[in-house]
């Protein structure tokens, strides 16, 4: 899939939650929470500033990130679901 986000947008592929709890209980799809972690697969050029400059994103392709549960828009391509987020929607980079 080829997608190029614009400006300060970032495309993230959500990392699915475990299907089995630490205690060995299988978690059905209906009980799973939406993922709030993902891997960055594309990054825009940056946020345009009022003075004409562009703020370079601090997020890079390949970073693992945490984002808000209701942040961004969902995009589905080739059977895979992606999130398109603004850089400000990213809460943390997982190291």
From Swiss-Prot:
<dbReference type="GO" id="GO:0005737">
    <property type="term" value="C:cytoplasm"/>
</dbReference>
<dbReference type="InterPro" id="IPR011032">
    <property type="entry name" value="GroES-like_sf"/>
</dbReference>
<dbReference type="GO" id="GO:0044183">
    <property type="term" value="F:protein folding chaperone"/>
</dbReference>
<comment type="function">
    <text>Together with the chaperonin GroEL, plays an essential role in assisting protein folding. The GroEL-GroES system forms a nano-cage that allows encapsulation of the non-native substrate proteins and provides a physical environment optimized to promote and accelerate protein folding. GroES binds to the apical surface of the GroEL ring, thereby capping the opening of the GroEL channel.</text>
</comment>
<dbReference type="InterPro" id="IPR020818">
    <property type="entry name" value="Chaperonin_GroES"/>
</dbReference>
<dbReference type="GO" id="GO:0005524">
    <property type="term" value="F:ATP binding"/>
</dbReference>
<dbReference type="GO" id="GO:0051082">
    <property type="term" value="F:unfolded protein binding"/>
</dbReference>
<dbReference type="InterPro" id="IPR018369">
    <property type="entry name" value="Chaprnonin_Cpn10_CS"/>
</dbReference>
<dbReference type="InterPro" id="IPR037124">
    <property type="entry name" value="Chaperonin_GroES_sf"/>
</dbReference>
<comment type="similarity">
    <text>Belongs to the GroES chaperonin family.</text>
</comment>
<dbReference type="Pfam" id="PF00166">
    <property type="entry name" value="Cpn10"/>
</dbReference>
<keyword id="KW-0963">Cytoplasm</keyword>
<protein>
    <recommendedName>
        <fullName>Co-chaperonin GroES</fullName>
    </recommendedName>
</protein>
<dbReference type="GO" id="GO:0046872">
    <property type="term" value="F:metal ion binding"/>
</dbReference>
<keyword id="KW-0143">Chaperone</keyword>
<comment type="subunit">
    <text>Heptamer of 7 subunits arranged in a ring. Interacts with the chaperonin GroEL.</text>
</comment>
<dbReference type="GO" id="GO:0051087">
    <property type="term" value="F:protein-folding chaperone binding"/>
</dbReference>
<dbReference type="GO" id="GO:0051085">
    <property type="term" value="P:chaperone cofactor-dependent protein refolding"/>
</dbReference>
